[in-house]
From Swiss-Prot:
Functional note: Probably involved in guanidinium transport.
Protein name stated in the entry: Probable guanidinium efflux system subunit GdnD
Assigned protein family: Belongs to the drug/metabolite transporter (DMT) superfamily. Small multidrug resistance (SMR) (TC 2.A.7.1) family. YkkC/YkkD subfamily.
Keyword line: Cell membrane, Ion transport, Membrane, Transmembrane, Transmembrane helix, Transport
Length: 104
């Protein structure tokens, strides 16, 4: 259950960052509202996961999910570059998060 909470927390963190980007684009208050909800829910789920997972593992996986997710959202929806080097390093982050899960 803690891994489900952690994965959901990472996805919500990515959603919060995406809402921050949306707010910078069109300054609507709804983006701030969604940003706050996304980050609050993310921190809550992260804290639940950290009840049983080691802090270092939980935090590394949480930030990894947010980093990879944010980069992929940027590539897929905001026209950010998708060159081979960028994809390689995104894959390294993802592989590291999976590795931490396997040893925890």
């Amino acid at each position: 259950m803690e891994w489900i909470c952690l994965i959901a927390a990472g996805i919500l963190e990515m959603l919060g960052v995406t809402m921050m980007n949306q707010f910078h684009k069109d300054k609507r208050v709804r983006w701030i509202f969604l940003l706050i909800i996304g980050f609050a829910a993310s921190f809550f789920l992260l804290s639940l996961a950290m009840e049983t997972l080691p802090m270092g593992t939980a935090y590394a996986v949480w930030t990894g999910i947010g980093t990879v997710g944010g980069a992929l959202v940027g590539i897929l929806f905001y026209g950010e570059p998708k060159d081979g080097k960028r994809i390689f390093f995104i894959a390294l982050i993802l592989g590291s998060a999976v590795g931490l899960k396997l040893i925890s």
